[in-house]
Amino acid sequence: MKRISILAVVLMTVLTLQAQDYIGVQFGYARSLTRLNTPESGKSLNPTGYNGLKVGFVYDATIVKGFGVTMGLNYTFGANATDWMKKATIQQGLYPQIRSRGQYHQVEIPVDWQYKFEIAKRTWLMLYTGPTLQCGLIFKDKWYARSDNKSNAFTHEENLYSEEDMEDYALKRLNVTWGIGAGFQYERYFLRGGYDFGLINPYKAYQFTEVVNDGNPRTRGRFDQWQIKLGIYLWEK
């Protein structure tokens, strides 16, 4: 067993030394979606989209015959907004109009297995799949309410990570997704895009399952993301 372990380490070291390595920067568009799935309907309820930007560093290593790995460190920002809309509550006479503004900030560490195939000199198409660890920094909504004649108004801000603010719907800061995608590379320039599926329930389970959905443990949330990135490799071995 010891010999096998040593051989595996030596083999990985040799492959890494022979790999075609790139280090670069990337930026692009990200659209994150919070979803609530129920087993009864089979559909996503209350999806909320956040449009934003992604920027970060990427390491790309082609190890053998087009197969390799990419790793990155990204910062992602997203925001959404609603138009003024009517609401039906006991306060309707005082504040019948509401709107909201939301935003989130997070750090991401993607690790993807990748296959590149060369279609022309120093020109490749690529396919990739792999997990991403997301760590939330800020996730908040701000609500605005006003009367029809705009004489009365107030604002209210909620921290979606706070149990005090969100009661039964507080979110976890850590999330894991699994992504699939494709891309194109010409010399040092590349374009990559894909979709990340949330693997864990982002809602704090003891509140979300036991309080809001008691007796239905299969009801869960998801935090997904569309993304497309442009980049340039600044260093190549």
Feature-to-residue mapping (PLM):
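Outer-membrane beta-barrel channels and translocator barrels
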Residues: 20, 62-66, 118-122, 187-189, ...
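Residues on the lipid-exposed face of transmembrane beta-strands in outer-membrane beta-barrel proteins
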Residues: 25-29, 53-61, 73-75, 109-115, ...
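Positively charged n-region of N-terminal signal peptides that target proteins for export
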Residues: 1-4, 18-20
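Sec-dependent N-terminal signal peptides
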Residues: 4-15
